[in-house]
């Protein structure tokens, strides 16, 4: 027997075919959300207050400082917030200190800063009662970037961009004459030397002294001439720059200095963020720039004089190892330049300069200038950064240094929840800061308190806006646990500060070599977002700078053996190493088993020897995301189909009694455990009590833990979320163990579908184009039955004419329609309802009309009751029938928070039990999707020699052209697993080989080709050829025919065009388009076409008359003029074309004649008058014979919706 047994949780053992020893467990799969939010609460919030505070008034008399903050207990628990449509949030209190510098008085006060949304343990937020996820964003990292391009003459031109987190961009470029320019914030070009002069180095000699002489710099100096000799060079440059940035304004050196200081050197306006400083230091540091260059000077230890590297030495990794400690010192090869007093920044400029030989001409010395190891805490740009960037830019033209790839994951970073929230909070705080400053100058300094200065509205509004309407705050995908998990691990390049769909080219969307182990190369949506929305790989994590790291096993550099020491590397760091694949064969002592090893060096796949290997992958599945890692035999599937398989697993509907896959990949337990839908124990202990609603566990220290189970809760997508206990009384449970299965789980494992018996065969053409034939048993035995819960809401409000009332007494409704309502007119739990049934009886007062004498008498006798009311009951919409699962009533008397003007709210939940039926979409895990085309009686299905009928028939044509052979391997191994009675695990890229499958097939006593003879259930004859039959994990997807099928009888019309609305949600009509019209024209079906263009569309009067004729049984009248035709006529008249309609005798027909109307256009008032007459006639008829007209009234009240 190949394979070995592995336990997944306490309730499942699988035979695993993996060969590679796992040295690292998978991390917690939602830590990207939880870690980031916890960082925000612990550090991010405090950093932000420290940034904004202290706030001082314009005179500097008052200052408001931040002392501390605390989050109090949340108002609602998670479940209460869900029920009350509220936020799960905690009040934020901030302690502020107000200092009056004139009197020395200090006032401290606790100020309420609004309710702050809290993250649940599952990594989600509850906003207005709905679970939401904040998706992490992939953005370009702040830093210095260099790029190359080819101009129209075929010359290579270089460019550089300094990108801050917020603030002005700085760009360097050269023109066709090799003159270098700088642009500030995408404005007009400024010669680069002008910026250097503005920094305080006015003369040409000073500039050459700092930057060294090179061709482009000389050309620039020639162009940058001294025009106005009255001004010094520094002042002239400052004025020039000001003129380019603010054309038309009077230019002075002072205003230019303050403008440049505000643009670049004010930490409040220019922020590189720690990551920007880290990237800039890394890029401009001599440690990275000297590698591979030849020294043009001898470097010695400044203290001892000992030579570190002689002139002419090539700086390789070993030389750099001895050189690096010196380069980190503050005085090694540092040169200080003193700017003039007129400069923007007058502090001395410290640069680290080392001369190297030019690659083209060894005689030429080229300075390599570092930015002088600027402190990592410094957030804004320094003159040293600008000079060092210019030097890098000039060196590139000589072939020194390298350009950056913007799609490299070393240059793209993740903004997770914490940082996104911090940025949003900062916006709110800076708006508040303005208000505080204004109030400081207005209010009396002696009596003012912090509370009077603070207005928290902007802060609260910005947080509300972020959670409510940001592109990155999304309604959680709650179709099944895998969908939830994937949504929390999603990375989006879209959103504020990111890309837009239309501007994103192929390069951004493409798979990059740095995605390896960081972002899944397979899981991404099909369609316009392909490649812009990705998924985090299974082992990846995000470091403090927001870069994605992936773990590798360290290879000892002296023994060349693979150790169990794990290092997490970013994409930048990985570029320096050679990494071996996870499936490289090893000996027991960790040494490599083969002489040549397949490895990766940057973007190349190479074969190399053991002594060159630095690291080794930790696991074969570190390349892919969780959903992709759930696909067995992924290595045998084409990537396009694997993409569909990964995406469709997220759409699998939770079934009534799901089964974990017979052929899994071993990640099912971890995915279900971390998804947040399973019930997990918090402590070790023994189970004392179990029922469907709660589990009680006695801890070892004697305390009792009670766990409440989630029962039939409606998820975000209208699916049924339910938990079932899997422990028994007396069981010992460990901390972090699964106590109860959630939806789509079985025995603690992910169970998205079922394991039916599948045959690859045709059946009378019913398999054409991916259609699926299924056995009636799947319908009858509820194998693919799912429960769907829909929520409906009705509110009783105060109106101008009086309050609405929930009641059983509804006008013109028979007792039959009220049989399931209680005395308040609310439906009872457990009632079965159909489309159009009343769920909540509600009446709204009508406008008071002039009463007749008889009505006044009735009013006097019976009082209020004779008042006219309108029926505004909540009814079951089309296709919404089912069983009432729950009713929730909220009233002001019970202390429920309701929105203003609402006195009572009722929520009704209807559960539908949906069996699989023709038209439903199903799929396997390999992208093999199809729709059910026929349900075949069990006795007619093909059956196996032992009499077992097949469950599902798939078309064999779906395999060869799509190259997803994994489904066939799963089929064969699944059959063996079924016969052997075991569950199997075949991890991705490390699963069962063909020999393993052959052995399992043999062990199960199947034929060597794993096929079998099938017999026709109708005739009993065997089919000609042997058929591949086996077990495949097959899912029912959320695209169900019940949600899509739709037909319109009478419904609403668009106010503008007077044509029927579209779509199922609006109860709209089907579009009869251009091609469909051609089809009717081809058959000469003139009257059908006329009806479609008139009564069924926008002939306003005609359709009302037609409806009347149908109700009364009269012949249908002639159609009138469609509204769109009138529009056409008016359009042509507006163009000055006189258009007339003529009859057969060439006589003009007035459009009004065709409608027998007085007016050109049908008046809406006329329609409502007509409807009113209808209503009065109907009432008269109802009084004479109520029973006859009861069904008609229900329909007749509907045409009024067209207004």
Curated annotation (Swiss-Prot):
Name any Gene Ontology BP term: DNA-templated transcription
The terms under GO molecular function for this entry are: DNA binding; DNA-directed RNA polymerase activity; ribonucleoside binding
Q: Does the keyword Transferase apply?
A: yes
Does the record carry Transferase as a key word? yes
* Catalytic activity field: RNA(n) + a ribonucleoside 5'-triphosphate = RNA(n+1) + diphosphate
Q: Compositional bias of type Polar residues: which residue ranges?
A: 1190-1203
Q: Which family does it belong to?
A: Belongs to the RNA polymerase beta chain family.
The free-text function statement in the UniProt record for this protein reads: DNA-dependent RNA polymerase catalyzes the transcription of DNA into RNA using the four ribonucleoside triphosphates as substrates.
Subunit structure and binding partners = The RNAP catalytic core consists of 2 alpha, 1 beta, 1 beta' and 1 omega subunit. When a sigma factor is associated with the core the holoenzyme is formed, which can initiate transcription.
Q: What name does the UniProt record give this protein?
A: DNA-directed RNA polymerase subunit beta
Instruction: Please report the organism this UniProt entry assigns to the protein.
Output: Levilactobacillus brevis (strain ATCC 367 / BCRC 12310 / CIP 105137 / JCM 1170 / LMG 11437 / NCIMB 947 / NCTC 947) (Lactobacillus brevis)
